Every structure is written in structure tokens, then in C-alpha cells.
Amino acid sequence: MLTQFEHSVKEVENFNADCFRELKALSKPPQAVKTVLTGLVTLFKCKPIYMKVEVKSEIDYWDMAKHLMADPRKLKEDMLQFDKDNVSQAALAKIKDIIIENTDCTEERVKNSSSKCLTILQWIKSVYSYCIIKGNNKVSEKHEEKVKIEEPKDHPIEKI
């Protein structure tokens, strides 16, 4: 019997690299697609690309995802060879926030937005589950501790 991770790897093996090209070609991807690809970018530790939004800058995960999908065959191979044993606690905490606990990022919604993105979502979830089961299960504790450190109640956060 295949584990969840092994099953998702089989799905990635069957994933047509042209699907990455199709996703990359979207000029205005649905939010569910953006969310899943933000998770992919997070796992692959892509260098941030910033875009200006009014007066502040934000990380543009969509541009980062397009850059990651520039070579579809390489991305597919990278997903198949992904070092799931060395995913950082910060990456797992972010995946938990944007994918695992996000009620707008269900398999049904992602499939309705882009069936091609569903395999990527399932792969991300299986990497996360593998990490939690294999001992990186202190994600929630570390994440809560990080939030407490970053946002102390007696020190207001400056908003730009």
C-alpha cells in the first residue's frame, strides 16, 4: 500500500510538464491557484520578488511561481527529488497557514479553479504530512512562539 507521499509522487510522475506551461501562461490566475503556487514557492525557497502596491511593497508570489515554472521539466524533476527531510519549520508553518488551515484552499475549490493545480496541492499536502509524521511536528508550537515573539502586545507594530 502506498503512503500519501508515495501516491503524490506517482501523480507528479504522471503530471505532464505542459501543465506547468499552461499554469504559467495564466494572466490572472484564480486565487486558489495563486495560493497553491505560493505553497510551492515556499517549499522551494525561491528568492522573493517584490512588487509595489500603492505605497508599500509586497512579495509577488505569482511572479516567483512563474519563474519557478520557467523550466517545467526541471520543476517536475525537482518535485520528484524534493528533500522532504529538510523542510524548515518556517516553511512548514507557512504551508500550515496558507494551505492546510485555509478553508478557501480545499481540493474541491482548487480543482474547480484549475484541475492542473490539484496535483501540486496534493503534493504540497503530502510533503507537509510527511514532515509532521516524521518528526517536524512542532510546527504549531514553534509557529505560535514565533508569532508571540514577532508581535508583542506591549509594542505596536508599525504599519506602512
Task: List where the protein language model places each region.
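Extended alpha-helical scaffold/assembly modules in large eukaryotic proteins
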Residues: L2-I160
